[in-house]
Amino acid sequence: DNCIPITDEEYFEDDIVGLFCAWLKKVYGEDTLEENLDFIANALGNKGKTSREVIRNYFLKDFIKDHIKTYQKRPIYWLFDSGKQNGFKALIYMHRWNADTIGNVRVEYLHRIQRVYEKEIIRMQEIIDNSHYNKEISSATKRKEKLQKQIKETKDYDAKIAHLALSRIDIDLDDGVKVNYEKVQTADGKKMQILAKI
C-alpha cells in the first residue's frame, strides 16, 4: 500500500526495520541475518545498543537527509513527519502516489500508532502504580512522559493531515518533485507542513 512506518521502538513487524530484516533474510538467508545486521550497523556507526537499534536510529534520523542529498533535493521517497518527538514517520514512494495516499497514511498508520501510544501510556501507568522498584518507576515515568509528548504531536499532526486527506490530492509526475511536494501539502491555498523539509 506504498507506506512504510518508521518508529522509535519496535511496535510493528511491518515497520521499516522489520521489512529490512525480512529482505535481508530473503536475499542472504536467515543463518547470516545477525552477521549482516552487525555489518550494516557498524558501517552506519549510529547510536544504539544492538544492531537493530542502530539501523532503526539511522532510518529515524538520518536516512531522509542522505536520500535528499543523494537526489539533490528532489527525493523519490517522501517522509511523512509529525515533528521533533518522532511521534509519526512513514516513507512513501512518490511514483506510487494516488489521491488516497494521505487518507490511507492517516487511517491505516497514523491512527494505528496513536492507539499503540495510548495503550503504552496505560501500561506505563500500571507499572508506576504497582511497582516496588524505584528504578522501574523512574523508567516508566520517563517513558510515559515521552509517549504523552508523542501522542500530542500525532494528534496535532492528525488535524493538519485530515484536511489534506479530504482534499484527495493527486500528483502529476510530469510536474516534477518540487511542484508535487508542495502540491500535496497545500489545501485551499494554505500550506501545511506534513512532509520532511527538503
Language model features with spans:
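Terminal accessory regions of large proteins
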Residues: D1-I198
